[in-house]
Amino acid sequence: LVCFVVVVFMAAAAAMAGADRELKYLSHGGVDFPVPAGRLDGVVSR
């Protein structure tokens, strides 16, 4: 059972790494889009 969990975890990690590598390739090295800063609920911190 433990071996199965390790194999599934490694497969998931490999899939995520592949997706990340593909995104970097398709976006020519970087993804650039604006991200709003600050709190989304409108409250201003002191």
UniProtKB/Swiss-Prot annotation:
One of its GO terms (cellular component) is extracellular region. Its EC number is 1.11.1.7. Keywords: Calcium, Heme, Iron, Metal-binding, Oxidoreductase, Peroxidase, Secreted. Its cofactor is heme b; Ca(2+). Its main location: secreted. Binds 1 heme b (iron(II)-protoporphyrin IX) group per subunit. One of its GO terms (molecular function) is lactoperoxidase activity. It is found in: Secreted. It catalyses: 2 a phenolic donor + H2O2 = 2 a phenolic radical donor + 2 H2O. Removal of H(2)O(2), oxidation of toxic reductants, biosynthesis and degradation of lignin, suberization, auxin catabolism, response to environmental stresses such as wounding, pathogen attack and oxidative stress. These functions might be dependent on each isozyme/isoform in each plant tissue. Belongs to the peroxidase family. Classical plant (class III) peroxidase subfamily. This is Peroxidase 1. It comes from Catharanthus roseus (Madagascar periwinkle). The lineage of its organism: Eukaryota, Viridiplantae, Streptophyta, Embryophyta, Tracheophyta.
